[in-house]
């Protein structure tokens, strides 16, 4: 194997070879007989040719060096550009290690692998950018609805820059892509929600769903998947406006159906329509009772349904015209019942007799008369609602008066403490009755205050069967006060009577008195033997206004009142609080007045 020689040995061997060749050439020249001048000339040419060869070789070597250096510089520049584009900053790269190399070829050999590797990295990074950019452009087009102007604006802002292929830039693209994916998902869900709402509204209104959504965009009702669902702003706005339009139509139809159904229900009630006939429109009844937003039944607000209900109303109106007189009588009776229950005097201008006479004479249109009665019924219902609290208080007051009457009867029974059947029940009843009776004054005062407050609010008198309630209550308070005075006078008289009897007995001795009857009064509901006392009997509410203070009245639909009868009794004669036989009463009165000769007062 040949060894590479050093420059010194190479120069020595070259000189030796040249000297040998020169000596051989001189020998040839001698043999030829060349002159010295010719020899010098040929030697000069030979030397010149050698110099030219050396110079050419040196130039070639210099050019080769320059090319190698230029290649190295170009590679280094490309590597630097790739590193900057990829965002790679490696302090241990081969470019740092090349400074220790001895030749340009070694330097080139060191950086070329790095260049190839960076080029591969750039190609791979470019593929990632191109793929993400394509997805971004596609989603941007879907969101913008493939609008050229908007699409160019969004894509232009994402123009690919090959000088910036860093991971930071790639992450920005990926973040943008994820943002578009989320926006697409949100828009798609919103479109689906809108479409579902449109489907529900179309079902309720009986409108063709496919035709409705196709007016917004054909892709919303495609069954072939040739085109994806459009999620652009125009589609969302179109669906929003379509929903608003359908809801407006639903409101109009709902109100129309409600009005028509209301008329139908009134006619049903007037005509006493059977439940079987009403069942055909059960769904309509449900709609009227529901709120507009709760209606989801298909075709319930369709034009056909509304027309069917309207046709039914027209049919009943024709039937109503033929039965108008009967309906007027029926509604007038209903009005009188309402007035009786509310203790309000009914309008006499539409009484049964007058209504019948007006209809038979033809002076009044039955429809107008019926409308007038209907208005009066509604007015009575409203007034009865406002009077309800006071009427309830009146009922409680009357119940307390019944308990008071029963307690009076019970206290007059001398056998009330006997151990007979039902005695303990009557004792408990009496205890409850005393508690209730003690509350009567406060009940009356509160009722008066409540009534006056009602009169202030309504600016009219509270009439109870035609008589002002406050006047009734004031009369009751006055009568009750007279009753209390009568009780007090009786107690004083009884005390004086007992005192005189005792004095008489102490002077003249006691004498037997007639034996009293053990019979017990059982009027006004008291039953000494029954376990539960019956309710005091009352008359019905048919009394006239002139009998208000002399005749019992009805104060409720379930009970009859005996209070006004009691008021009259209290106002004409004192109550008999203790049952005293006639003989004892006469003797006692004579004793008190001193009419007997044996009496101390007589003496």
Curated annotation (Swiss-Prot):
Comp. bias regions, Polar residues: 515-526, 537-559
Gene Ontology annotations of biological process type: microtubule cytoskeleton organization
InterPro entries to which the protein is assigned, alphabetical: MAP65_Ase1_PRC1
Record-listed Phosphoserine modification sites: 513, 599
Coiled-coil residues: 48-79, 131-186, 468-502
Gene Ontology, cellular component aspect: cytoplasm; microtubule; nucleus; spindle pole
Subcellular location: Nucleus; Cytoplasm; Cytoplasm, Cytoskeleton, Spindle pole
Region described as Disordered: spans on this chain: 501-559
Gene3D superfamilies on file: 1.20.58.1520
Microtubule binding (site feature) positions: 419, 430
Primary location class: nucleus
Molecular function per GO: microtubule binding
Pfam entry (one): MAP65_ASE1
Family note: Belongs to the MAP65/ASE1 family.
PANTHER family according to UniProt: 65-KDA MICROTUBULE-ASSOCIATED PROTEIN 7, PROTEIN REGULATOR OF CYTOKINESIS 1 PRC1-RELATED
Assembly and binders: Forms dimer. Binds to microtubules (MT).
Name the UniProt record assigns to this protein: 65-kDa microtubule-associated protein 7
Organism: Arabidopsis thaliana (Mouse-ear cress)
């Amino acid at each position: 194997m040949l060894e590479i020689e050093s420059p010194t040995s190479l120069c020595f061997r070259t000189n030796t070879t040249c000297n040998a060749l020169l000596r051989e050439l001189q020998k040839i020249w001698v043999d030829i007989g060349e002159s010295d001048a010719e020899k010098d000339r040929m030697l000069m040419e030979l030397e010149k040719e050698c110099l030219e060869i050396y110079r050419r070789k040196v130039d070639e070597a210099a050019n080769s060096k320059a090319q190698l250096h230029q290649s190295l510089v170009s590679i280094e520049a490309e590597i630097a550009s790739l590193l900057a584009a990829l965002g790679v900053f490696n302090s241990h790269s081969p470019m740092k290690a090349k400074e220790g190399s001895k030749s340009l070829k070694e330097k080139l050999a060191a950086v070329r692998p790095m260049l190839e590797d960076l080029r591969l990295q750039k190609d791979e990074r470019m593929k990632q950018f191109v793929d993400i950019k394509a997805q971004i452009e596609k989603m941007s087009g879907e969101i913008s609805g493939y609008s050229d102007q908007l699409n160019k604006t969004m894509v232009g802002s994402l123009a690919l820059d090959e000088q910036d292929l860093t991971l930071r830039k790639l992450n920005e693209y990926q973040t943008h892509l994820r943002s578009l994916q989320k926006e697409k998902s949100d828009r798609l869900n919103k479109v689906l929600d809108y479409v579902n709402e449109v489907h529900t509204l179309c079902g309720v209104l009986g409108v063709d769903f496919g035709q409705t959504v196709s007016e917004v965009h054909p892709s919303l009702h495609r069954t072939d998947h040739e085109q994806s669902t459009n999620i652009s702003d125009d589609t969302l706005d179109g669906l929003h406006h379509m929903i608003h339009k359908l809801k407006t139509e639903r409101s109009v139809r709902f109100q129309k159906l409600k009005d028509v159904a209301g008329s139908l229900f009134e006619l049903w009630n007037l005509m006493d329509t059977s439940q079987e006939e009403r069942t055909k429109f059960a769904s309509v009844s449900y709609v009227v009772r529901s709120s507009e937003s709760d209606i989801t039944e298909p075709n319930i607000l369709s034009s056909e349904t509304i027309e069917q209900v309207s046709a039914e109303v027209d049919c009943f109106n024709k039937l109503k015209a033929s039965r108008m007189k009967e309906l007027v009588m029926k509604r007038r009776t209903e009005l009188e019942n309402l007035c009786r229950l509310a203790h309000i005097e009914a309008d006499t201008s539409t009484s049964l007799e007058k209504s019948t006479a007006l209809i038979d004479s033809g002076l009044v249109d039955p429809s107008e008369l019926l409308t007038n009665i209907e208005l009066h019924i509604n007015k009575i219902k409203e007034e009865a609602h406002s009077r309800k609290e006071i009427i309830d208080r009146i009922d409680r007051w009357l119940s307390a008066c019944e308990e008071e009457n029963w307690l009076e009867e019970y206290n007059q029974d001398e056998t009330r403490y006997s151990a007979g059947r039902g005695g303990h029940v009557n004792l408990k009843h009496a205890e409850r009755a005393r508690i209730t009776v003690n509350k009567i004054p406060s009940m009356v005062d509160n009722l008066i205050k409540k009534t006056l407050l009602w009169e202030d609010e309504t600016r009219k008198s509270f009439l109870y069967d035609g008589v002002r309630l406050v006047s009734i209550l004031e009369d009751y308070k006055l009568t009750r006060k007279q009753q209390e005075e009568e009780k007090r006078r009786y107690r004083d008289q009884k005390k004086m009577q007992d005192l005189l009897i005792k004095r008489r007995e102490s002077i003249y001795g006691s004498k037997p008195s007639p034996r009293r009857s053990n019979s017990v009064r059982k009027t006004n509901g008291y039953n000494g033997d029954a376990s539960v006392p019956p309710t005091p009997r009352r008359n019905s509410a048919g009394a006239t206004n002139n009998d208000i203070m002399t005749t019992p009245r009805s104060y409720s639909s379930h009970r009859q009142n005996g209070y006004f009868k009691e008021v009259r009794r209290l106002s004409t004669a004192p109550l008999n609080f203790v049952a005293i036989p006639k003989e004892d009463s006469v003797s006692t009165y004579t004793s008190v007045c001193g009419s007997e000769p044996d009496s101390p007062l007589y003496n």
